[in-house]
Design a protein with these regions (language model features):
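Beta-rich carbohydrate-recognition and catalytic domains
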Residues: 1-49, 55-112, 123-126, 131-162
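Hydrophobic core register within WD40 beta-propeller blades
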Residues: 53, 117-119
Length: 162
């Protein structure tokens, strides 16, 4: 499957493409579904800004189960500030509607004005997080900031890297 996460005012749109034939890349799209405050989704207060979705292998600390965790970064807001990361266990069989609702978090990476972000998982299993940040929205310019984050930090101890 392929997951698309796109920006929209107040949150995200999620859509899932499911392959019916990998060899020919045939398949079908689900429907784009809004993720925001009304479905306990990814809330972006007073903004529509690019972010990143990343799937990582993790261990649920309470159950000990191996899981796949979806991470979604966006400015939490209001406006373009307080970039953060939402998280959610996924199985790979979710519909767009399932994927859009019931996210946990967010973990706030910064309280400062901040906007676009991207992330990858490093070989040591930490999350490399790269984002725009500035001291004031009136400056019309961002600095690029790099941080390494642990999965346990992002999830408030609920998950750890596997």
């Amino acid at each position: 499957s392929v997951v698309v996460s796109s920006r929209t005012m107040g949150g995200r749109y999620f859509n899932v493409f499911r392959y019916s034939d990998f060899g020919t890349a045939e398949g079908i799209w689900d429907s784009a579904v809004y993720s925001g405050a009304q479905n306990n989704g990814c809330v972006a207060l007073e903004n529509a800004c690019n972010g990143e979705i990343l799937m990582v292998s993790a261990k649920n600390v309470d159950s000990g189960a191996d899981v796949t965790l979806a991470l979604q970064s966006i400015p939490i807001g209001p406006q373009r500030q307080a970039v953060g990361i939402y998280f959610k266990e996924v199985t790979g069989s979710e519909s767009s509607n399932d994927l859009a609702s019931d996210w946990s978090g967010p973990f706030r990476v910064t309280e400062k004005p901040s906007a676009y972000s991207t992330m990858i998982q490093l070989k040591n299993k930490d999350i490399a997080f790269y984002y725009e940040e500035c001291d004031s929205l009136r400056t019309y310019g961002y600095d690029m900031v790099y941080k390494e984050l642990q999965l346990s930090e992002i999830t408030d101890g609920k998950y750890r890297s596997k």
